[in-house]
Amino acid sequence: MKQRTLKQPITVVGIGLHSGQDVTLTLQPSEVNTGIRFLRTDIEDAPLIAADAFLVTDTVMSSNLMVNGIKIGTVEHLLSALAGFGIDNLLIKVSDAEIPIMDGSAANYVTLLLEAGIEEQAAPKQFMKILKPVKVVEGDKWAQLEPYDGFSLDFEIDFNHPGIPKDTQRYRFEFSLHNYIENVGNARTFGFMRDIEHLQKNNLALGGSLDNAIVLDDNGIMNKEGLRHQEEFVRHKILDAIGDLYLAKYSLIGGFSAYKSGHALNNKLIREVYNDPNNFEIVTIYDTSSVARAYEI
């Protein structure tokens, strides 16, 4: 299986979740073995910021990267879509400190990638194959990666709320690009009205609205159109996890499972994997393998 980039650049304008301002985002093809990199176009001589778990400095509400004091935030939804398509090399130019929130899912990014087209490159794609179980725990929350022939995610959340029935709080996802687009990529982020009001009083989540999130009050869902999936809440957590795990810098061959995990714990898990070289190996695979077929467009 070969490395992938885009066939052509593509640009979109969207709202920054926290700033509430318009953000211009350009996805630009990049050479083999350059990886996923971000560039702030609003700052002169800004450094390139790699999509790297070890550059994550802040995980409050999103995954945020920083180099030399220059920050790029809310990267997980875009990275999730890139992981879904197996994009290895891309230069992401952004006109502000955060990636636009779009509709709160990765669906708009899926559309952008399909419009730009996927280019196979003249170098083998590399995967991180998990060799041993690795688990991180914080209180009652945990996240784990273990050996698995493919890529799967099993996630459980725990909310005591009438709008999030208990029988919709766990979801198991067997990765393929088609499965991603149909079942996870369009699951929106969610939040509680009381929290959003508090954040906006502190000049955060200024771009948050019913257009880019599922919002719950004390009684239920405020969005008139309802949910896209019965388990949209936990499916979005899987979307987030796929993006957070892509900060490992490789597509994964392994099984991910989690209970009440979030950006901080997902990041801690990747760092823990790297902590012992015996936890993983970097491999290439044949186009005919089941892992490669999962990325067929």
UniProtKB/Swiss-Prot annotation:
Which pathway, per its entry? Glycolipid biosynthesis; lipid IV(A) biosynthesis; lipid IV(A) from (3R)-3-hydroxytetradecanoyl-[acyl-carrier-protein] and UDP-N-acetyl-alpha-D-glucosamine: step 2/6
One family name in Pfam for this protein = LpxC
A GO cellular component annotation here is:
membrane
Catalysed reaction equations from the record = a UDP-3-O-[(3R)-3-hydroxyacyl]-N-acetyl-alpha-D-glucosamine + H2O = a UDP-3-O-[(3R)-3-hydroxyacyl]-alpha-D-glucosamine + acetate
What keywords were assigned to this record? Hydrolase, Lipid A biosynthesis, Lipid biosynthesis, Lipid metabolism, Metal-binding, Zinc
Active site residues per record: 263
- Enzyme class comes to hydrolase
Q: What is its EC number?
A: 3.5.1.108
Q: What is this protein called?
A: UDP-3-O-acyl-N-acetylglucosamine deacetylase
The cofactor named in the record is:
Zn(2+)
Q: Which biological process annotations from GO are given for this protein?
A: lipid A biosynthetic process
| Family assignment from sequence similarity | Belongs to the LpxC family.
State the Gene Ontology terms under molecular function. metal ion binding; UDP-3-O-acyl-N-acetylglucosamine deacetylase activity
Job description of the protein: Catalyzes the hydrolysis of UDP-3-O-myristoyl-N-acetylglucosamine to form UDP-3-O-myristoylglucosamine and acetate, the committed step in lipid A biosynthesis.
The entry's Zn(2+)-binding residues are 77, 236, 240
What's the domain of life for this entry? Bacteria
Does this UniProt record's set of keywords contain Membrane? no
